[in-house]
Amino acid sequence: MKASRVAVIGGGIGGLTAAGLLAKEGHAVTLFESGPTLGGKAQAVMVEGLTLDTGPTLLTLPALVRGTFEQLGALDLLPPFTELEPQCTYHFTDGCGFTAYKDLERMADSAAELRPVERKGVHSFYAEAAAIWRAAGEPYLEAPFEGMAGFMARVARRGIGAMLAGMKMDTLHALAAKHFQTHHLRQYVGRFATYAGGSPYASSAAFALIPHIEHAYGVHHVRGGIGALVDALGQAVRRLGVTVHLDTRARFERITEGYRVEPVAEVFDSVVVNADPLASLRRESEPLSLSGFVLLLEVEGRTAVPHHAVMFGGDYRKEFDELFAGQLAEDPTVYVCNPSATDSSMAPPGRTGLFVMVNAPAMPLEEGRADQARRDWESSAERVREQMFEKLVRHYPALKGRVRVVGQRSPVDLAARGAPGGSIYGFLPHGRFGPFRRPRIRGGTPGLFFAGGGTHPGGGVPLVMLSGRFAAQMASAHLREVA
């Protein structure tokens, strides 16, 4: 098979994965990244010796990530992982707490402190989550999603039990209410809808596969942060011969010979777009998933804040009602990541870096309304910062007077990096079959493919890598057909 020319537009994790795998097959690959650095949303910053990720902060499905590096011939570049136990600490407004562990018995013990009956709920919930994983999760991830017919055929191969598990799925909140009596654990389960930028009151119970994945495969920290993983991917693709252009905003058009890509004015046989399909397709009326507002903090000295912690607001349903009405939450849930709790390389001695985030509504895509939303953020940011500080100090009072802001990221910043409306995942996966309506990898013209968190199979580092693998697989098949 002769070497074909492939353009990859976007240097996020999905684009890097696709570029590397296509180069490994012998294709001549050129990657165009509009920003000054690779990684897409998976960026990291260094501030006075602190290293802080500004995008994803954890890793699941480690075997998938290792497998990708193995396919790239780059296991020697892969940073080591540390599995976290406990995985995350949860705080509630009534002073109660809950800790998630990989060890189900320890998690059940923590749940029983809220109410003894919740011990049984932990076991029954995770059993049903595992069934959903087998019924829908595994077939969803084993091949590119090309339509419900192919997906249901993969489900059917798992037997009638899998078919029934898929048919009875309700919302994620309804599933949580079925197994848990306390609002605490219903909130805990509901939070996993936000991994795709959705509301637990409108997202499918299929999202229960996320806590199952964390329980079954663990929550991991990459030494040096996710930014170190991006650096390793960048080294891998360059070593494979991929030509990388940074600070280059590429455009493409379909022509008889293939695709002309500007500004290089060269013709390519195939194009992989590592950008949200909604932005590329300009669907301004498409509802968007949530965005986020991030503070990067420096703390004087070390802190008792665990690696991952969540501080819930008091009324979870109201919080999502406000967010999807385009408003900031009055009492937001706050997530904090303290990577130096596990990895001393992330901060110098005597100092700590914290990543702190709240959910935020995506900005409108229509130009006039988008301009107003950007102006609104200029006046809203200070209020959101105060809410985040108040909640952080309420649950970790030793932080008072020791914290300094060293950076922030708003939906405006995400939009500037190409996220439609600043939405983290673009497509909104609400509805019973929401996850299966996600934009597909195959584009609308021959030889065009998409990779990234906005397409199948979804967001998060391993799934974005998988989208890159699928895009490379489909592009290679196309190139063989036209060779």
Q: What residues fall within each predicted segment?
A:
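N-terminal glycine-rich phosphate/pyrophosphate-binding loop and immediately adjacent elements
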Residues: K2-G137, F427
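Active-site/ligand-binding neighborhood in enzyme catalytic cores
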Residues: A130-L240, A416-G431
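A glycine-rich dinucleotide-binding beta-alpha-beta segment and adjacent secondary-structure elements
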Residues: T182-A196, D331-Y335, R394-P457
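A conserved beta-strand/loop element that lines the FAD pocket in flavoprotein oxidoreductases
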Residues: V237-A250
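Mid-domain catalytic core of redox enzymes
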Residues: T248-P348
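FAD-dependent oxidoreductase catalytic-site/capping-region signature
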Residues: Y335, A341-Y425
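A conserved FAD-binding loop/helix module that cradles the flavin
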Residues: G453-A475
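Active-site-proximal substrate-binding core of FAD-dependent oxidoreductases
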Residues: A477-A483
